[in-house]
Amino acid sequence: YKRQEVESLAKNHWASFWEKCAAVDFSHCTDPRAPELERRVLLSQYLLAIQSAGSVPPQETGLTYNSWFGKFHLEMIWWHQAWQPLWGHANLLDRTLGWYETVEPVAREIARRQGFPGVRWMKMTDPSGTEAPSNVGSFLIWQQPHFIYLAELVYRANPSDEVIKKYNRLVQETAEFMYAFATYDEFHGRFILKGAIPAQETLRAATTINPPFELSYWHFAMQTAQKWRERAGEKRNLEWDEMIDKLSPLAYNEDHLYLASEDAVDTYKDIRFTSDHMAVLGSVGILPMNKLIRDDYMKNTLHWVWDNWNWGKTWGWDYPMTAMNATRLGEPEKAVGALLMDKRTNTYLQNGHNYQDGRLRCYLPGNGGLLTAVALMCAGWDGCQVKNPGFPQDGTWDVRWEGLKPMP
C-alpha cells in the first residue's frame, strides 16, 4: 500500500469503529474523578482495538512487547475481550473465537490423556494450541468456561441461528469436560470441584476444594450450555441438570465471610489467602447472583476485602472485578472507588496503558476489565431495574450513554 492508501483506509476504519461502538459521556458529572475515568475508558477502547482483536487471543501486553515468552493465557481472554459485544464490537470477539476451533484437536487430546470427555482448554499457549509446561498453569480451570460465556455474549449481541450453528458444538464439548471434571460427593450428596489451582493462584491444587469463583462459574456455564441445547432444538442433558442442582454452595466461616476455598479455614488469618486475586468477589460481578451464594454474606466479604486485603499484591483486573461485585451488590460508591483506587497496579499511564511494575509496564486485561465494568455499571444486567446501577445516585455522577448491552 502507498502512504495515501494507508491513510485513507485508517481514516475509514476508525470512523467506522467509533460510529458503530457504544459511547459513555461523563461530561455532565461533577465528581472530580469523572474526567480521569473518561480518559481511561476512551484510551482503553483504542488500545484494545489495535491489540486485542486479532485472529488469535492476545498476550497480556498485546503487540507492545512480549510477556511470558510471548505466550497468551486463555484465562485472560475474558478480560481482554468480553467488553467487545457489550460495546457494539461483537465482530471483534467473533474473529478471535474462531481460533478455538483450530486448536480443538489439541484440547481434545489433553482431555483424553487425563481421562475426560470433551475438550479441556489449555491455559498458557500459542497460536498452535500447544500447552506450555507449568507447575501452576496446567492446574487452572477457570479458562474452561470462558468459551461458553464469550459465545453467549456474541449470541446476545446477534441472537441468530447462524451463531448457534457456529458455536454450539464447542459449547457442548466444553460443558462435557466440565461435567466430568466435577466429582460427586456421595456422603454429602453434592458435586465438588477439586484437583485445581483456582484463579487466586496462592492456593494449592492438592488440597483445594470448592474454590468459590470456579463453583459459581461452573453453575453459570452449565446453565448456559443447557440454554444453547434448547436453542439448537436439543433436549436438556438431565445429568447436567442434576449437577447444576447439586453443586456445593460457597463455604463460609463463623463471621459469615466466604472462604478462599472450602478447605482454607484460615482464609482471613493467613496472608497467603488475602493476597493475589480476590477471586471470591468474581463469584458475583463477573457472574450473576446464583443460588450457591447469599448476598448478605457476599456483602460482608466485599466489605472485609475492601478494608483489609493485601492490595499491594494485586493485578490490574482485580479493580474492575471488585467494581462489578460492588455494582451487583448495590454499592455504587465502592464500584467507582474500586475503578479509581490509588494503587500501583491500578495506574493508567498517560498513553492509557495499565501499569503494573517495571516488568509489566502495560497490562491489557486491566483495560478490558475496566470497559466491561463500566458497561455493567451503566447498562446493568438481565433483570436489573436500576438506572446506572454502578454509579452513586447523589447527582454527582450524571453518566449518559448509548449502545451498551446488559450483562447476563
What are the language-model segments listed below?
Residues 15-21, 50-61, 116-128, 142-149, ...:
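Active-site-adjacent bridging/hinge elements
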Residues 122-133, 201-207:
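Aromatic- and acidic-residue-enriched carbohydrate-binding clefts of CAZyme catalytic domains
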Residues 2-71, 90, 100-108:
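Acidic/polar, glycine-enriched structural segments that form the non-catalytic walls/loops
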Residues 388-408:
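Surface beta-strand/loop "capping" patches
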Residues 54-67, 108-115, 119-123, 180-198, ...:
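Glycine- and aromatic-rich loop/turn segments at beta-sheet edges
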Residues 70-109, 127-130, 136-161, 165-169, ...:
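Active-site core of glycosidic bond-cleaving carbohydrate-active enzymes
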